Swiss-Prot record:
Function (record text): One of several proteins that assist in the late maturation steps of the functional core of the 30S ribosomal subunit. Helps release RbfA from mature subunits. May play a role in the assembly of ribosomal proteins into the subunit. Circularly permuted GTPase that catalyzes slow GTP hydrolysis, GTPase activity is stimulated by the 30S ribosomal subunit.
Its EC number(s): 3.6.1.-
Enzyme class: hydrolase
Organism: Hamiltonella defensa subsp. Acyrthosiphon pisum (strain 5AT)
Positions of the UniProt region annotated as Disordered: 1-38
Composition bias type Basic residues, residue spans: 1-21
Biological process terms in GO annotation: ribosomal small subunit biogenesis
Similarity remark: Belongs to the TRAFAC class YlqF/YawG GTPase family. RsgA subfamily.
Cellular location(s): Cytoplasm
InterPro entries: G_CP_dom, NA-bd_OB-fold, P-loop_NTPase, Ribosome_biogen_GTPase_RsgA, RsgA_GTPase_dom
Protein name: Small ribosomal subunit biogenesis GTPase RsgA
Cellular component annotations (GO), alphabetically ordered: cytoplasm
Pfam family, one: RsgA_GTPase
Assembly, per entry: Monomer. Associates with 30S ribosomal subunit, binds 16S rRNA.
Length: 352
């Protein structure tokens, strides 16, 4: 069912009210809100740990967590959002108290994906790094890696490429895999090889997660849950296990709600179900081509301005591929992704 759109005046009123609530003095701005004040403590900074419909779990500056109501003027709230919230005050007759989210700070980044029903849907906010997890089982897919890289570049979020399950490789197989991954090393992406089973490479991974908010992406079966259990402290592991067991014991598509976890050595993780498969149909052709960073030196140098980089004469990109300056695998993946977004059509999504 199509949602009713807000008018420009409604948007302005909501935004003004929202900005007003970012200041603590605004929390008793009318008589109706005075009833709320008796139920809630002082306003404080917090971060959204998880979102559940009209409620959210929020963590305060001292590490305390509480499920919260969300003010109606808060139009968008996702895991990772920095908020102004007020904890609920416990009462003897009602121990199941909830706090309230009053306002959301401006996001420094937001990870989105296209959705047939809701247009462009936010999944997580304030991310510093997308960890692209691949494995030798199932087969290593460079096309999937390139899709995640396009998203990372379009959002200006640092990507980290991670190959898991390397303990399953023979020395010769590992050498062949490394030749494929050198495509990314050669264009200055960081590539790590790890094993959640043996612990190889985990220390390097922990160093790359330090003091950052990361989100793990990748197909089912690449071992993300095993990695997280290796990285997370026991208290967070238990939360993760409970979240997984609610859905399935099979280890496939088991995360149903985005959640923020804390690494013991420092840094945070957002685990999100929507990150597993990316649709890129909401991106423009320009965003797609800019997502292939090694193309940037050649874009605009073709003979014809409308060059499609397929069989056009004097194509700078094709010439770079032939000279070995651009990997053919990446060039082929670019055309495959571009064909996909052309087929699906940007018109399917409302970005207003």
């Amino acid at each position: 069912m199509k949602k009713n759109k807000l008018s420009k005046n409604q948007h302005r009123r909501i935004q003004a009210h929202h900005q007003y609530r970012l200041h603590p003095t605004s929390l008793t701005d009318d008589k109706n809100n005075q009833l709320d004040d008796a139920q809630f403590g002082e306003p404080q900074q917090g971060v959204v740990i998880s979102r559940f419909g009209q409620h959210a779990d929020v963590e305060g500056h001292q590490g305390q967590q509480q499920r919260c109501h969300i003010r109606r003027n808060v139009l968008s709230l996702v895991t990772g959002d920095r908020v102004i919230w007020r904890p609920g005050i416990p009462r003897q007759e009602n121990r199941n108290v909830k706090g309230i989210v009053e306002a959301v700070h401006e996001r420094k980044s937001v990870l989105t994906r296209p959705d047939f029903y809701d247009g462009i849907k936010p999944m997580a906010a304030n991310i510093d790094q997308i960890v692209i997890v691949s494995a030798v089982i199932p087969d290593l897919s460079l096309n999937m890696i390139d899709r995640y890289l396009v998203v990372s570049e379009s959002l200006n979020i640092k990507p980290l490429l991670l190959l898991n399950k390397i303990d399953l490789l023979t020395p010769n197989e590992r050498k062949k895999i490394n030749l494929r991954l050198n495509i990314y090393r050669n264009i200055h992406y960081t590539v790590l090889e790890v094993s959640a089973q043996t612990g190889e490479g985990i220390a390097d991974l922990q160093a790359n997660l330090l003091d950052r908010v990361s989100i793990f992406s990748g197909q089912s079966g690449v071992g993300k849950s095993s990695l997280l259990n290796t990285l997370l402290p026991p208290t967070e592991q238990q939360i993760l296990v409970e979240a997984l067991s609610e859905k399935s014991a099979l280890g496939q598509h088991t995360t149903t709600t985005s959640r923020l976890y804390h690494f013991q050595q420092g840094g945070d993780l957002i685990d999100s179900p929507g990150i597993r498969e990316f649709g890129l149909w909401h991106l423009t052709q320009e965003q797609i081509i800019q997502g292939f960073i090694e193309f940037r030196d050649y874009v605009g140098h073709c003979k014809f301005r409308d060059c499609a980089h397929i069989d056009d004469p004097c194509c700078a990109l094709r010439d770079a591929v032939q000279k070995g300056h651009i990997a053919k695998e990446r060039f082929d993946n670019y055309h495959q992704i571009l064909s996909e977004i052309t087929l699906k059509g940007k018109k399917l999504f409302n970005q207003d």
